[in-house]
């Protein structure tokens, strides 16, 4: 490799490189890692030199991760040029920066499109789409990914496996972000082969796909086609299987790269992947992905005026929620993209940051368990989609420098918190799986206002600051002293009713919403009456659904109002806590409670307004015994991380425009002084308690 380009007198290669070889590389990274997506135009250009010099300032953490994608490594098919990447990698190593090196598969060389047009995506209608900057190809095309980094020609892995800057392999980039469904002749042929073992386990395609109703009786598996536009309603189970097929295709592609030559060439350098927010068009099955990932990087952007406070964002986008997805086991460090300024493609829904918001939101993520912070874009580029993205080292450095100072101050105390986990709190047991979005895509919702992500935000918002931030979890996770929410509209549940009842006999209070368990894992209706699998547990029976017209509400005797949905509920052991006061459901229970074992199961026959959700949450918290990490003023988000030996650290994030009181004692780690009981406006306090 070429000698690193001299930056200035006194620059030396990274002397800690050999120490990183003794363990998993990210485990040796000191404290909090801070970096961003670095896409240089050239390793020698003026902007690159400015980046390197800026990174050496104390405001920027020397051990930060930088993503260096491999675009341009194959300018002509079969001809490789690593010169610029060698120079960039060497310069980053000389600066002390660790790199998450991309696998160069996010975009193919332009010449490949002429020879291999099959890598272009095909829509359900049969139209072939054209090329774009990246993420436009059909993943899984072995012929494309192997020439640079596959098993047959492992140039990238072999070349950089021992490079002192390497810390992570960044496998592809944002898989499934723009192309998550796979059509075309090859996919039509592969879909039946995927469906066969699944449907054989379910006693054949006739029962598995409900063909008696859908007039699709098959004589062989080869007759099963991928769902395409049709003049009438499509089979929802077949659509669900196709979504599984597409998600598994992404997983197979990732595994081929991550578990292939990269793992063999450097077993101590783990792979990672960026997760896109759980919203269409991305339909990943995150729980299947969790089995494959050792560390991941998750998009986390501020939600605009509707979700001004970061606490109203989906908790799933934070690190502790990834721990829950992993089944409660500790995960390896991951990187969350720190909220950026509004980009030209997000301006309609995202606001610019307020003073201190970047540091505040970043440490919110740290409080939830992450160890790596990444900014969305670093480095100036004249040609780019995101023309107004924020960079850690921008031309107006004061706010960013302040951010870097805060992170550096926190990183110096990071070793104290490292290894701790967030415990307790309220658990949202929503299976954020791809099938939860199928109903929305198929148009088979019982009410058009069931907007999955909007409902999750509504359930999440009131339980962020009052007590302990929520954790999203999976059905297999055992709960103790936690409140369980099920706000899944029409979400299939794989758990049979007897198993649910046995598992919950001694549980703490739980709460299920309307239509949460009415269908099974194959999107088929559970027979025997509603609310499906939870009917006996909840002590209610639903006679009839009463969907509400759009933008209308129904009055409740507690002073709340219900929206979207209502049901004619009969009590079969439960007691009515709130009832409807409007015809045709006057006097019919709207919120019920059923004592089960030492706990209780609550049921919502309508979707309460914000006041109702807060009141209901207060009741559930009081009944469950969940306690806030500390007493604090409204608008202060609290999270506690603890070690097994009892040491604990309280994160207090003040989202207010005025200072707020927090009842806690200990040393404030960022300032290094005793905590005085108040958190300044828009600031964060990290308190070593005791």
Curated annotation (Swiss-Prot):
Extract the InterPro entries matched here: Beta_galactosidase_C, Beta_galactosidase_Trimer, Class_I_gatase-like, Glyco_hydro_42, Glyco_hydro_42_N, Glyco_hydro_b, Glycoside_hydrolase_SF
- What EC number(s) would the UniProt record show? 3.2.1.23
Q: Which BP terms in the Gene Ontology apply to this protein?
A: galactose metabolic process
* Control of this protein's activity: Activity stimulated by beta-mercaptoethanol.
The top EC class, named as a word, is hydrolase
Q: Per the UniProt annotation, how does pH influence activity?
A: Optimum pH is 6.6. Maintains activity over a broad range of pH values from 6 to 9.
The record's function comment reads: Highly specific towards beta-D-galactoside substrates. Hydrolyzes 5-bromo-4-chloro-3-indolyl-beta-D-galactopyranoside (X-Gal) and o-nitrophenyl-beta-D-galactopyranoside (ONPG). Has activity against p-nitrophenyl(pNP)-beta-D-galactoside, but not significantly at all towards pNP-alpha-D-galactoside, pNP-beta-D-glucoside, pNP-beta-D-mannoside, pNP-beta-L-fucoside, pNP-beta-D-xyloside, pNP-beta-L-arabinoside, pNP-beta-D-galuronide, pNP-beta-D-glucuronide, pNP-beta-D-lactoside or pNP-beta-D-cellobioside.
The residues the record assigns to binding substrate are 173, 345
In this protein, the active site sits at 174
Q: What protein does this entry describe? A: Beta-galactosidase
Q: Which GO terms describe its cellular component?
A: beta-galactosidase complex
What are the record keywords, sorted? Glycosidase, Hydrolase
Q: Does the keyword Hydrolase apply?
A: yes
Q: Which organism is it from?
A: Arthrobacter sp
What family does the database annotate?
A: Belongs to the glycosyl hydrolase 42 family.
Hydrolase: present as a keyword of the record? yes
Temperature section of the record: Optimum temperature is 45-50 degrees Celsius. Activity declines rapidly above 50 degrees Celsius. Stable for at least 70 hours at temperatures 35 degrees Celsius and below. At 50 degrees Celsius loses all activity in less than 15 minutes.
Record field: catalytic activity = Hydrolysis of terminal non-reducing beta-D-galactose residues in beta-D-galactosides
* Recorded GO MF terms: beta-galactosidase activity
């Amino acid at each position: 490799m070429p000698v690193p380009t001299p930056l200035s007198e006194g620059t030396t290669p990274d002397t800690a490189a050999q120490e990183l070889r003794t363990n998993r590389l990210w485990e040796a990274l000191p404290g909090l890692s801070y970096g961003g997506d670095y896409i240089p135009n050239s390793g020698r250009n003026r902007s690159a030199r400015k980046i390197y010099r800026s990174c050496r300032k104390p405001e920027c953490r020397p051990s930060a991760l930088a993503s260096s994608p491999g675009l341009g490594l194959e300018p002509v098919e079969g001809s490789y040029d690593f010169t610029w990447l060698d120079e960039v990698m060497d310069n980053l190593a000389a600066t002390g920066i660790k790199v998450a090196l991309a696998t160069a598969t996010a975009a193919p060389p332009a010449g490949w499109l002429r020879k291999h047009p099959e890598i272009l995506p095909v829509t359900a209608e049969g139209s072939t789409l054209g090329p774009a900057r990246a993420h436009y190809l059909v993943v899984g095309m072995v012929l494309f990914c192997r020439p640079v980094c596959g098993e047959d020609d492992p140039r990238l892995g072999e070349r950089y496996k021992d490079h002192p800057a390497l810390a992570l392999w960044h496998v592809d980039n944002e898989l499934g972000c723009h192309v998550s469904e796979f059509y075309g002749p090859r996919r039509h042929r592969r879909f039946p082969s995927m469906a066969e073992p699944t449907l054989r386990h379910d006693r054949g395609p006739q029962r598995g796909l409900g063909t008696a109703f859908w007039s699709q009786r098959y004589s062989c598996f080869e007759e099963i086609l991928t769902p395409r536009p049709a003049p009438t309603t499509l089979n929802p189970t077949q659509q669900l299987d196709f979504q599984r097929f597409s998600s598994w295709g992404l997983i197979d592609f990732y595994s081929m790269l991550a578990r292939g030559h990269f793992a063999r060439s450097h077993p101590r350098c783990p792979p990672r992947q960026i997760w896109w927010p759980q919203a269409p068009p991305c339909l990943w099955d995150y729980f299947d992905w969790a089995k494959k990932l050792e560390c991941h990087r998750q998009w986390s952007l501020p939600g605009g005026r509707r979700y001004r406070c970061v606490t109203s964002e989906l908790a799933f986008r934070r690190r502790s929620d990834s721990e829950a997805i992993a089944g409660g086991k500790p995960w390896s460090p991951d990187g969350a993209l720190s909220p950026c300024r509004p980009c030209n493609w997000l301006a309609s829904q995202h606001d610019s940051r307020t003073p201190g918001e970047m540091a505040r939101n970043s440490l919110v993520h740290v409080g939830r368990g992450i160890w790596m912070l990444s900014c969305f874009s670093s480095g100036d580029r004249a040609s780019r989609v995101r023309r107004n993205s924020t960079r850690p080292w921008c031309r107006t450095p004061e706010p960013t420098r302040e951010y870097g100072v805060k992170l550096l101050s926190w990183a110096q105390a990071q070793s104290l918190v490292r290894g701790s986990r967030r415990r307790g709190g309220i658990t949202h047991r929503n299976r954020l799986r791809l099938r939860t979005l199928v109903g929305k895509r198929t148009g088979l919702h019982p009410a058009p206002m069931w907007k999955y992500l909007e409902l999750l935000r509504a359930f999440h918002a009131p339980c962020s600051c009052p007590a302990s931030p929520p954790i999203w979890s999976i059905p297999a996770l055992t709960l103790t002293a936690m409140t369980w929410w099920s706000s899944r509209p029409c979400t299939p549940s794989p758990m049979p009713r007897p198993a649910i009842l046995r598992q919950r006999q001694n549980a703490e209070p739980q709460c299920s919403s309307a239509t949460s368990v009415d269908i099974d894992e194959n999107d088929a209706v559970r027979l025997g009456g509603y609310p499906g699998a939870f009917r006996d547990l909840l002590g209610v029976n639903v006679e009839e659904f009463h969907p509400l017209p759009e933008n209308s509400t129904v009055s409740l005797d507690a002073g709340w109002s219900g929206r979207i949905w209502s049901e004619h509920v009969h009590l079969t052991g439960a007691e009515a806590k709130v009832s409807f006061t409007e015809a045709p459901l006057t006097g019919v229970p709207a919120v019920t409670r059923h004592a089960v074992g030492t706990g209780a199961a609550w049921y919502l026959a309508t979707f309460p307004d914000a006041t109702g959700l807060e009141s209901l949450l207060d009741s559930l918290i009081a009944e469950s015994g969940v306690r806030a990490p500390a007493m604090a003023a409204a608008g202060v988000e609290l999270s506690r991380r603890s070690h097994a030996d009892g040491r604990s650290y309280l994160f207090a994030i003040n989202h207010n425009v005025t200072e707020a009181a927090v009842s806690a004692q200990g040393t404030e780690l960022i300032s290094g002084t005793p905590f005085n009981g108040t958190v300044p406006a828009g600031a964060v306090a990290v308190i070593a308690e005791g």
